Swiss-Prot record:
Protein name: tRNA uridine(34) hydroxylase
Domain Rhodanese residues, every copy: 130-224
High-level lineage: Bacteria, Bacillati, Bacillota, Bacilli, Lactobacillales
E.C. number: 1.14.-.-
Active site: C184
Molecular-function annotations in GO: oxidoreductase activity, acting on paired donors, with incorporation or reduction of molecular oxygen
Physiological role: Catalyzes oxygen-dependent 5-hydroxyuridine (ho5U) modification at position 34 in tRNAs.
Pfam families per the UniProt record, alphabetical: Rhodanese, Rhodanese_C, UPF0176_N
Organism: Streptococcus pneumoniae (strain Taiwan19F-14)
PROSITE patterns registered for this protein in UniProt: RHODANESE_3
Reaction catalyzed: uridine(34) in tRNA + AH2 + O2 = 5-hydroxyuridine(34) in tRNA + A + H2O
GO terms (BP aspect): tRNA modification
Amino acid sequence: MAKDIRVLLYYLYTPIENAEQFAADHLAFCKSIGLKGRILVADEGINGTVSGDYETTQKYMDYVHSLPGMEDLWFKIDEESEQAFKKMFVRYKKEIVHLGLEDNDFDNDINPLETTGAYLSPKEFKEALLDKDTVVLDTRNDYEYDLGHFRGAIRPDIRNFRELPQWVRDNKEKFMDKRVVVYCTGGVRCEKFSGWMVREGYKDVGQLHGGIATYGKDPEVQGELWDGKMYVFDERIAVDVNHVNPTIVGKDWFDGTPCERYVNCGNPFCNRRILTSEENEDKYLRGCSHECRVHPRNRYVSKNELTQAEVIERLAAIGESLDQAATV
């Protein structure tokens, strides 16, 4: 299948004057050329992923590079056969990635233009992965890690990036007096978080420059030492990274078998991202727990228009019922 769609991943920390108006103007331009995607704009900069055909994406890159302060913005480009987004969103936010330091009673937010970890090239990062005296920390959410991660990297038990500072403080014995290198999808989270670690007093902090997305495209390392796939926040869900010896590390939520298919839990008040096969999605009503399976607003049940009798039958098949907890 021809790959005539380009997906652009990018960010830039740079002061943006009147960022709310900038976001409105940016949205208008994106819509005028037929671009699709999701862009966040804040006083501190811009962070986005967009997709379109070659002509459209080229127009967009030229436009962004014409904006004051964004002449050298780095676009990471994937070639795909289908659009990665269905609509176009540009939103003004307080931060382009929500670390939430002020919300969580930390001192002040981090300005990566002033404080950030040392940049590591893909080759240097690979060397760090092989160094037994270096701690490698994945700064992404737990469900991103579970789909794929660097071999030996620490998995933080977090569901949101803003939980990471407190998690590190609670687990500081893993990091103190050690060299720490961090990584994320494209680099935007690491720019800020590595700066926070420097401010916290960690003496030797590095970050994978350009993120996993760049590591997978580097002609020298070719994504080696990455296991699984990389989670992305668009219609693709997962993309390849390791072009040397790819593996599957994702495990089905229900039976532990190898799996790289993500869905959201059927309970809208849970909405947990879970890996599961289509067969197990049907079997377990897309509920990550008994409570979620029997929730009155279970989206899987409503979407498939299951009758109560059909729900009871499926629950019985896995040893559960509507009015009692799971027996298996």
